[in-house]
């Protein structure tokens, strides 16, 4: 039964996901981590590309979320549709515009274009926070330093006197003061450095070490290192790089002379220099004497001194953090990290914590980062923070791979560093196939999102906006250690598809194993089908059945379709190959294993990756799309459906082009998307009843079968969600690397358009959440929802303690004062929802067919419902031992 919905009932909200933010100028400044510990060291404040999150170090939970989209000022700064988006470069504790500020709940945020915002990270976000703009000409803010009430800012700029092809940056150092009378920041020039290759700041923020190149000479090896004090003249020295290179090093390869990282201690006495060869040089700045630390096999990517200079942290491609005791030359290791270490810092006034940034370079389509906060005393993990980890079909924009001694798909060598950036930019603009789709599955039981991530799977809670688990599902080198140098060419097994049975009790994965390169068998791939299960009290999935080459040697699986509940209680699935073959797998309780039950041999004389499957709810019919043919099969006989006598039933359709996806709606209509059209076929009539032209958006853009990731169906109402991505052009009509997308909601036969929404980024996937909503993911790893109901806790910043201030008491009482406070809080919630409704209705009055519709963040529909104190009477039943989150959920159920 199809539910009749009006266009105003669907709303769009961007509510979850996001990437942890790094300093965009980190390739120059060397300090990538922007996250800060609070003054009491109980909270860890970390910026994302769409929000700022505050984590409790003790409970490991996110206790506050400041979403940019929920504040007009923040959304105006960070969510503009521009090629160079605003990004956070520094967070300082307190309000720096007020001297001697003692409020521990405030932070001052600096952006790369000079915006300064003062935010409250505890309690409710102020509607109009303080906002200032530092006047910068053609400069970008790179860092901000603070010492005893004095402030310095470091900016980067392109020196116009240098050649156009010169990619080096120049620095300016300014003194920063706030004029309270004029209510503005003023800057005073302090120093300037040109052609900076690399730099780093001491952990106390008082010393700057940088390496510059002399471009006036033809000698590309002529480089110098300088160490300067930012707030006084106590330290100011410079020396050529060659003076700290041994004669043996100078005669070896360029990797032994290429500096990949640096660190300066707080006293200005020691300088650590890491090379692409893996060697670390400790330089005594008093006499330029050096000693070598050798353990790393590939490039040293990060270095940091402890506060007293007695320890050195180092990290690289080995996925191991090394802690060097400099007096004794002894080492401690923290191995088996999830990624290579691209940044390490010492945090806290006493250096109680180490912060690490890991990059999972196995995914070369995206920059996947994970932030770790470690206890310095025992190296135990206190926090592990990351967003969704999608693997896109093609490499997206702004991807930066670390430097390695070798040039591979997952790394950049010294010679290819700048060339790879230009090549990738040209490819993004000129390539015809702009396929940035990804594969995501939703668990039918707990609604968690499953992201296949090369050899592993990430389990992400959409509603809590947190990673639940990260589990390796294949056997590969990368599972237990990092790869260095030539090992980077070894390809790990890749999980290409993942499905769940309808009851959510079984997970089905399909992976491909690759043999080593440069062998006669290099093209002989191994295809593996695995069936997994887990108990409710377990975290990891357990392998039950493994099938090697299920469709034959070197025959890939092109489609997996779980069975409906009517077939073996949903514990079954279909697999299809690229030659028209079908196999039915089912769990056999007698064998206590998954077994092959039925097989349909290939019945086509050619190969195609355009394969689609659909299954009727009663399990009797299978719809098999292969190339441009759509066949109806009888499940009992596993052969082409044959009609009864005296009846005429169409059992095969021929479409205009290759079929990309097939969706069966209410066992009546079949939605078929090809390269050129979107069709609705009425099975009772045996004819196409509605059709839309998709040729300008789909033809040649997506890989065969990937259009299925951009079309989904609400199995309860029959409504269809379709995503259309469009590449933007500049004023001259030249294509750019930016995109916008449109989500269109249709009814079950495509006759009525129920919703039309525009999003400012490329949408890579959309899926139905087994309830009333559609969830989507864009290439910035942000998650959104299009649905008839949107949870207020998702669209608003997390602030449970602030919303429930009127409810917190040692004992729950019914006094008049508590009732008044409770009613006031509920009134604020209701009034905020009504304001959102008014804004949403005005937005949706626009013409749904307008091609350049502006993006609106719509925070969901609230039902007009009478709320009084009697509405909450039942909520106080069994109130003992109820957590605040559960109590808040009860409030929201009453309101919605």
Swiss-Prot record:
GO cellular component annotations of the record: 90S preribosome; nucleolus; nucleoplasm; peroxisome; rDNA heterochromatin; small-subunit processome; t-UTP complex
SUPFAM superfamilies: Peptidase/esterase 'gauge' domain (SSF50993), WD40 repeat-like (SSF50978)
Annotated localization: Nucleus, Nucleolus
Record keywords, A-Z: Nucleus, Repeat, Ribonucleoprotein, Ribosome biogenesis, rRNA processing, Transcription, WD repeat
InterPro entries listed in its UniProt record: WD40/YVTN_repeat-like_dom_sf (IPR015943), WD40_repeat_dom_sf (IPR036322), WD40_rpt (IPR001680), WDR75 (IPR053826)
Biological role: Involved in nucleolar processing of pre-18S ribosomal RNA. Required for optimal pre-ribosomal RNA transcription by RNA polymerase I together with a subset of U3 proteins required for transcription (t-UTPs).
Descriptive protein name: NET1-associated nuclear protein 1
The species this protein was found in: Saccharomyces cerevisiae (strain ATCC 204508 / S288c)
């Amino acid at each position: 039964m199809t539910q009749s919905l009006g266009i105003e009932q669907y709303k769009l909200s961007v509510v979850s996901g996001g990437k942890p933010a790094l300093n965009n100028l980190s390739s120059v400044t060397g300090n990538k981590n922007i996250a800060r510990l609070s003054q009491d060291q109980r909270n860890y404040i970390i910026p994302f590309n769409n929000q700022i999150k505050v984590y409790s170090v003790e409970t490991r939970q996110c206790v506050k979320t400041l979403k940019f989209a929920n504040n007009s000022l923040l959304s105006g700064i960070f969510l503009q549709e521009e090629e160079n988006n605003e990004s956070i470069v520094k967070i300082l504790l307190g309000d720096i515009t007020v001297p001697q500020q003692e409020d521990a709940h405030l932070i001052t945020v600096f952006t790369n274009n000079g915006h300064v915002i003062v935010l409250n990270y505890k309690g409710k976000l102020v509607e109009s926070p303080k906002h200032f703009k530092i006047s910068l000409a053609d400069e970008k803010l790179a860092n901000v330093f603070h010492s005893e009430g004095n402030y310095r800012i470091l900016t980067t700029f392109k020196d116009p006197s240098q050649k156009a092809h010169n990619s080096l940056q120049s620095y300016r150092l300014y003194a920063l003061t706030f004029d309270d009378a004029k209510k503005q920041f003023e800057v005073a020039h302090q120093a300037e450095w040109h052609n900076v290759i690399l730099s780093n700041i001491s952990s106390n923020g008082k010393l700057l070490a940088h390496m510059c190149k002399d471009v006036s000479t033809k000698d590309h090896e002529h480089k110098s290192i300088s160490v300067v004090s930012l707030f006084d003249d106590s330290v100011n020295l410079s020396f050529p790089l060659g003076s700290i290179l041994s004669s043996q090093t100078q005669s070896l390869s360029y990797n032994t002379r290429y500096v990949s990282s640096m660190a300066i201690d707080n006293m200005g006495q020691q300088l650590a220099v890491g090379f692409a060869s893996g060697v670390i040089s400790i330089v005594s700045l008093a006499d330029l004497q050096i000693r070598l630390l050798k353990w790393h096999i590939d490039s040293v990517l990060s270095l940091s001194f402890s506060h007293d200079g007695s320890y050195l942290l180092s990290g690289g491609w080995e996925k191991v953090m090394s802690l060097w005791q400099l007096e004794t030359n002894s080492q401690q290791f923290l191995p088996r990290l999830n990624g290579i270490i691209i940044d390490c810092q010492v945090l806290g006034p006493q250096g109680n914590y180490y912060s690490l940034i890991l990059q999972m370079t196995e995914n070369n389509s995206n920059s996947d980062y994970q932030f770790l906060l470690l206890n310095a005393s025992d190296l135990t993990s206190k926090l592990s923070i990351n967003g969704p980890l999608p693997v896109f079909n093609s490499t997206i924009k702004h991807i930066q791979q670390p430097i390695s001694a070798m040039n591979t798909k997952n790394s950049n060598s010294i010679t290819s560093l700048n060339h790879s950036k230009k090549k990738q930019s040209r490819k993004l603009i000129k390539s015809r196939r702009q396929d940035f789709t990804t594969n995501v599955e939703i668990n039918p039981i707990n609604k968690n999102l499953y992201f296949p991530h090369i050899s592993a799977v990430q389990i992400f809670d959409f509603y809590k906006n947190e990673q639940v688990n990260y589990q390796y599902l294949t056997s590969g080198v990368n599972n237990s250690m990092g790869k260095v140098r030539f090992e980077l060419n070894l390809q790990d097994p890749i999980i290409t598809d993942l499905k769940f049975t309808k009851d959510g009790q079984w997970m089905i994965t399909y992976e491909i194993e690759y043999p080593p390169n440069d062998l006669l068998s290099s093209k002989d791939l191994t295809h593996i089908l695995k069936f997994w299960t887990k108990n409710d009290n377990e975290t990891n999935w357990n392998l039950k059945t493994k099938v090697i080459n299920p469709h034959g040697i070197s025959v890939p699986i092109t489609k997996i379709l779980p069975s409906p509940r009517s077939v073996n209680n949903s514990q079954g699935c279909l697999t299809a190959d690229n030659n028209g073959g079908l196999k039915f797998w089912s769990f056999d309780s007698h064998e206590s294993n998954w077994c092959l039950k039925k097989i349909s041999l290939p019945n086509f004389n050619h190969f195609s990756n355009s394969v689609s499957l659909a299954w009727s709810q009663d399990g009797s019919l299978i719809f098999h799309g292969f190339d441009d043919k759509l066949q109806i099969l009888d499940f009992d006989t596993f052969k082409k459906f044959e009609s009864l006598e005296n009846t005429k039933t169409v059992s095969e359709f021929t479409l205009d082009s290759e079929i990309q996806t097939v969706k069966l709606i209410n066992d009546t209509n079949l939605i078929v998307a090809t390269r050129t059209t979107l069709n609705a076929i009425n099975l009772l009539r045996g004819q196409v009843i509605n059709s839309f032209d998709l040729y300008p958006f789909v033809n040649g853009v997506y890989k065969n079968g990937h259009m299925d990731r951009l079309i989904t169906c609400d199995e309860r109402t029959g409504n269809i969600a379709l995503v259309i991505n469009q590449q933007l052009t500049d004023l001259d009509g030249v294509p750019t690397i930016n995109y916008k997308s449109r989500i269109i909601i249709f009814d079950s036969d495509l006759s009525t358009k129920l919703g039309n929404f525009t999003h400012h980024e490329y949408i890579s996937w959309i899926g139905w959440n087994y309830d009333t909503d559609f969830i989507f993911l864009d290439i910035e790893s942000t998650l959104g929802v299009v649905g008839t109901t949107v949870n207020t806790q998702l669209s608003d910043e997390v602030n449970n303690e602030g919303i429930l201030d009127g409810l917190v008491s040692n004992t729950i009482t019914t006094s008049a004062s508590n009732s008044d406070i409770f009613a006031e809080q509920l009134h604020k919630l209701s009034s905020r929802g009504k304001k959102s409704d008014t804004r949403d209705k005005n937005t949706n009055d626009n013409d749904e067919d307008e091609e350049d519709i502006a993006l609106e963040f719509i925070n969901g529909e609230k039902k007009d419902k009478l709320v009084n104190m009697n509405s909450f009477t039942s909520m106080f039943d069994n109130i003992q031992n109820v957590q605040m989150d559960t109590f808040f959920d009860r409030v929201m159920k009453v309101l919605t």
